[in-house]
């Protein structure tokens, strides 16, 4: 289960890992042993995508899209069709799923989706089993951690506030914080600036080709995770340090 993040943690200082190791459940022993023997790297800042990287919100996303699409007579898209749009903007996703290109209609779909999400999203979103331990270990190691997502920041915080202390993450950049969404590097570069980090010491972790392209455009290293609908083969087409399955 924890193999997804093995490569990411290869840069955590070994002495600090030993200090936090005893806070982690025994089932993660092999994970941390692997980390301790890995070659040291120079990352101090770890920025994550959210959906399909740290959390599985697919049930909530499918429910919200389905309710809006059905309301307007678009019943053909399957659940997998909807899941394949995760990581894109709402306007892009609705255009793909409905064929609609009119910006006013897409804006109305988005408005309806947000209203649906107020009811269905957070309650239908779960963190991946390793997420808490991975973020806690990084935090305890002294690394800077954050999230870069097309999802609204307040929506991400709704879930994280149930699991972490306030301001546990150093930064969350959501869809409302940027002018141009991923794969524009705007959000990623914004986080790097605000954290007073450098590109060379930053690793971006995500599950989609949108994330891979974002890292490439920002000029930062990328690690891919196949938690979602994107295959390892698709991710490998982009510069990467590691693709984890």
Residue ranges: model-predicted function:
Residues 76-81, 105, 167-171, 199-203:
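Short acidic capping loops at alpha-helix termini that bridge into adjacent secondary structure
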Residues 203-243:
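Acidic, Mg2+-coordinating phosphoryl-transfer loop and its flanking beta/alpha structural elements
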Residues 8, 17-48:
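Non-catalytic pre-domain segments flanking phosphatase-related domains
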Residues 85, 89, 126-130, 151, ...:
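Short beta->alpha linker loops
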Residues 3-6:
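Intrinsic disorder
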Residues 70-72, 93-100, 124, 132, ...:
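Substrate-recognition/cap helix-loop segment adjacent to the acidic, metal-dependent catalytic center
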Residues 42-132, 137, 141:
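N-terminal helical cap/lid subdomain that shapes the substrate entry/recognition surface
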Residues 45, 182-212:
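Conserved Lys-Pro-Asp/Glu-containing loop-to-beta segment of HAD-superfamily phosphomonoesterases
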């Amino acid at each position: 289960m924890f193999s997804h993040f093995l490569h990411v943690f290869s840069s955590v200082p070994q002495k600090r890992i030993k200090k936090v190791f005893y806070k982690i459940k025994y089932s993660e022993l092999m994970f941390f042993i692997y980390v301790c023997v890995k070659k040291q790297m120079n990352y101090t800042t770890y920025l994550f995508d959210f959906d399909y990287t740290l959390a599985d919100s697919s049930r909530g996303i499918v429910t919200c899209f389905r309710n809006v699409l059905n309301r307007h007579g678009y019943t053909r898209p399957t659940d997998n069709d909807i899941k394949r749009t995760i990581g894109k903007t709402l306007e892009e996703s609705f255009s793909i799923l409905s064929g609609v290109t009119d910006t006013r209609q897409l804006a109305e779909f988005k408005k309806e989706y947000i209203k649906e999400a107020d009811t269905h999203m957070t309650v239908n979103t779960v963190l991946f089993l390793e997420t808490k331990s991975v973020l806690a270990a990084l935090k305890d190691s002294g690394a800077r951690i954050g999230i870069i997502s097309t999802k609204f920041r307040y929506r991400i915080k709704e879930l994280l506030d149930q699991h972490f202390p306030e301001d546990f993450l150093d930064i969350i950049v959501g869809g409302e914080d940027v002018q141009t969404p991923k794969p524009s590097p705007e959000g990623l570069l914004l986080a790097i600036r605000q954290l007073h980090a450098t590109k060379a010491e930053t690793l971006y972790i995500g599950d989609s080709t949108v994330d891979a392209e974002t890292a490439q455009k920002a000029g930062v290293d990328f690690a891919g995770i196949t938690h979602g609908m994107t295959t390892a083969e698709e991710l490998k087409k982009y510069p990467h340090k590691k693709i984890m399955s």
